[in-house]
Amino acid sequence: MSKLKQGTFITFEGGEGIGKSTQCQMLYEYLKSQNIPVILTREVGGTNVAEKMREILVHTDLLPMSELLQAMAARYDHMVKKIIPALQAGNIVICDRFIDSTACYQGLELENGIELVYNLHKDLMPPLMPDLTFFIDVESSIAIERVNSRNMSNKFDVRGLDFYNKIYDCFKGLSKKFPERIVTIKASDLNPEQVHELIKKHLNLI
């Protein structure tokens, strides 16, 4: 029996160049093909306002606290205008990044920043956390090679291997901190179709 029910909130997490967005799209297309109500969205972004904030965040050098607050403001708009209404209407919501990315990308830049991110979410955001998070685990050396081979880039893409390792270690740590929510998919040696099948298997869709 599928683990999915109406109003399930699924997020995909990990660093740059790991195929996370591809897996979001593949799961979205599969659920649509099964006539399951589903929407696909992303962070930072997902609404007109949040997408404008995204452009600032990914292409502008901001102070660490400014960057964190920008991400949180975009999330509030996204949650209130899109995610929560979709869940209340019975949709599965697939989100490409959510709070764990904020913890790793913005929280690491601040003293006790990871704890601060989750506390701010608890205190300021609507009371919602993902039901399930897939961490796409790809080694940093592979991820940075993939990023270097593509034309699109933002300020996070072009940082060096040390940055990629730091982000990778952060997500690994979060997967151990929240094992009841975060499922690790080891994907370094797998193609996108194989990763997709593992995700479907975990959701009891096959």
From Swiss-Prot:
<dbReference type="GO" id="GO:0005524">
    <property type="term" value="F:ATP binding"/>
</dbReference>
<dbReference type="Pfam" id="PF02223">
    <property type="entry name" value="Thymidylate_kin"/>
</dbReference>
<keyword id="KW-0418">Kinase</keyword>
<comment type="function">
    <text>Phosphorylation of dTMP to form dTDP in both de novo and salvage pathways of dTTP synthesis.</text>
</comment>
<dbReference type="InterPro" id="IPR018095">
    <property type="entry name" value="Thymidylate_kin_CS"/>
</dbReference>
<keyword id="KW-0545">Nucleotide biosynthesis</keyword>
<dbReference type="InterPro" id="IPR039430">
    <property type="entry name" value="Thymidylate_kin-like_dom"/>
</dbReference>
<keyword id="KW-0547">Nucleotide-binding</keyword>
<dbReference type="InterPro" id="IPR027417">
    <property type="entry name" value="P-loop_NTPase"/>
</dbReference>
<protein>
    <recommendedName>
        <fullName>Thymidylate kinase</fullName>
        <ecNumber>2.7.4.9</ecNumber>
    </recommendedName>
</protein>
<dbReference type="GO" id="GO:0006235">
    <property type="term" value="P:dTTP biosynthetic process"/>
</dbReference>
<dbReference type="GO" id="GO:0004798">
    <property type="term" value="F:dTMP kinase activity"/>
</dbReference>
<keyword id="KW-0808">Transferase</keyword>
<dbReference type="GO" id="GO:0006227">
    <property type="term" value="P:dUDP biosynthetic process"/>
</dbReference>
<keyword id="KW-0067">ATP-binding</keyword>
<dbReference type="GO" id="GO:0005829">
    <property type="term" value="C:cytosol"/>
</dbReference>
<dbReference type="InterPro" id="IPR018094">
    <property type="entry name" value="Thymidylate_kinase"/>
</dbReference>
<comment type="similarity">
    <text>Belongs to the thymidylate kinase family.</text>
</comment>
<feature type="binding site">
    <location>
        <begin position="14"/>
        <end position="21"/>
    </location>
    <ligand>
        <name>ATP</name>
    </ligand>
</feature>
<dbReference type="GO" id="GO:0006233">
    <property type="term" value="P:dTDP biosynthetic process"/>
</dbReference>
